Structures are given as structure tokens and as C-alpha cells.
């Protein structure tokens, strides 16, 4: 099973401030949807709650695993797709393997990305040409461990960005 992170980050690796993304790039959201639709996504509880606050519902079309330290936690809403609680990364990976998943998409936040880094196979990143203030950051990437393949540079509302794929070196 491949473990794939999907992330939008600034040049300073910022991914968020106060549980929100510090930019709004519609093309990035469409790219995220294209990468994750129909696949199981793994996220932390704070990311799940941030999605609920923003969308008013869980992400549609994607079974969701929420990683939390709280054995009592349960989602307050029920989506069309299953929402599963995992108490550890190992627990989440075991559930994913038991379901026969080919890929598990890791969608944040910062603590979850940090926990998964050593096991990630691929990182699908949107690299944004800004260094916003933040309180959540994606871990640093060692070029000795990752092969970087950038796509074409684009702009949205005057903000430059590039979709980049990182694959772990063999």
C-alpha cells in the first residue's frame, strides 16, 4: 500500500494559521479533489474539524480516517462516506491494509504529516510562492531522500504556485 501526502505549502513550509489555510487558490482545491476523490483520506482531528467548519460537512466522495488521541472522540456529523477513528498511525495503517487499499491519502495537519514522513512514498505538493505567517508547517524535505518533479508554474489572483510531485528515492 502506498502512503501519499497531499499538501499545499508556502516557501517557508507553512500550511496553516489558526486551523485555516492562509490562501485560497481554487485551482489547488480542484487539484486536491482530483487527487483524493474516491480514495480513503487520513487526517488529524483538528483538520477534520476545520473541514467541517469550512464546508459544513465532511469531504464528499472519500471515506475518511481521523487520527485522534481521544478514545472517546466520535464525529458529530455523519457523511455519505464512512468516518473511522484511528488512535494511532499504526492503527490507521492496519485498518487501511485490512480494507485492501492500494493507497492511503494523508491530508494533514502538521502533526499527522510529521508522524507519517518516514513512511510516505509520494508527496503531492502545491508549492505556493509566498511565506505567510503560520502556526502549522510541513516537515523539511531532504533532497537526498526525495526526487522532485515540478509541473508548470501557474498563477491565481496574482499568487504563483506549482504542482510538484516528490517520490521517495529507492
Regions found by a protein language model. Name each.
Residues 1-170:
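Enzymes that bind and transform nitrogen-containing heteroaromatic metabolites
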